[in-house]
């Protein structure tokens, strides 16, 4: 088996940057930053969302609109008036008198 083909699997400290929540988990994440947690030094990875801040786990429904896409949409289309629904038109096949539709041909 070849040496040095797989990344090193080790315990890494993950820190939620929005809540400050910290947890240790096995990972191959590569970093030079380290931090002391519960008396041991671990490589550290800063994450923006974890189980302590994600709405699914916290039960809060919060709209995160970092891009402002909803505001742009509302600003662009707020002045447009909704048009009245168009009446449906029925289209019928009109054949000249005396001509009948030919039956569908069967494929062999």
From Swiss-Prot:
<protein>
    <recommendedName>
        <fullName>Large ribosomal subunit protein bL31B</fullName>
    </recommendedName>
</protein>
<dbReference type="InterPro" id="IPR002150">
    <property type="entry name" value="Ribosomal_bL31"/>
</dbReference>
<feature type="compositionally biased region" description="Basic residues">
    <location>
        <begin position="97"/>
        <end position="108"/>
    </location>
</feature>
<dbReference type="InterPro" id="IPR042105">
    <property type="entry name" value="Ribosomal_bL31_sf"/>
</dbReference>
<feature type="region of interest" description="Disordered">
    <location>
        <begin position="85"/>
        <end position="108"/>
    </location>
</feature>
<dbReference type="Pfam" id="PF01197">
    <property type="entry name" value="Ribosomal_L31"/>
</dbReference>
<comment type="similarity">
    <text>Belongs to the bacterial ribosomal protein bL31 family. Type B subfamily.</text>
</comment>
<dbReference type="InterPro" id="IPR027493">
    <property type="entry name" value="Ribosomal_bL31_B"/>
</dbReference>
<dbReference type="GO" id="GO:0005840">
    <property type="term" value="C:ribosome"/>
</dbReference>
<dbReference type="GO" id="GO:0006412">
    <property type="term" value="P:translation"/>
</dbReference>
<dbReference type="InterPro" id="IPR034704">
    <property type="entry name" value="Ribosomal_bL28/bL31-like_sf"/>
</dbReference>
<dbReference type="GO" id="GO:1990904">
    <property type="term" value="C:ribonucleoprotein complex"/>
</dbReference>
<keyword id="KW-0689">Ribosomal protein</keyword>
<keyword id="KW-0687">Ribonucleoprotein</keyword>
<dbReference type="GO" id="GO:0003735">
    <property type="term" value="F:structural constituent of ribosome"/>
</dbReference>
<comment type="subunit">
    <text>Part of the 50S ribosomal subunit.</text>
</comment>
């Amino acid at each position: 088996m070849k040496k040095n083909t797989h990344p090193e699997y080790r315990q890494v400290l993950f820190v939620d940057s929005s809540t400050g929540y910290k947890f240790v988990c096995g990972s191959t994440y590569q970093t030079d930053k380290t931090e002391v947690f519960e008396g041991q030094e671990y490589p550290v990875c800063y994450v923006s969302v974890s189980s302590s801040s994600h709405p699914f786990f916290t039960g809060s429904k919060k709209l995160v609109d970092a891009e402002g896409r909803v505001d742009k949409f509302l600003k662009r289309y707020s002045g447009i008036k909704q048009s009245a629904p168009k009446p449906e038109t029925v289209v019928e096949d009109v054949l000249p008198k005396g001509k009948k539709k030919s039956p569908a041909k069967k494929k062999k």
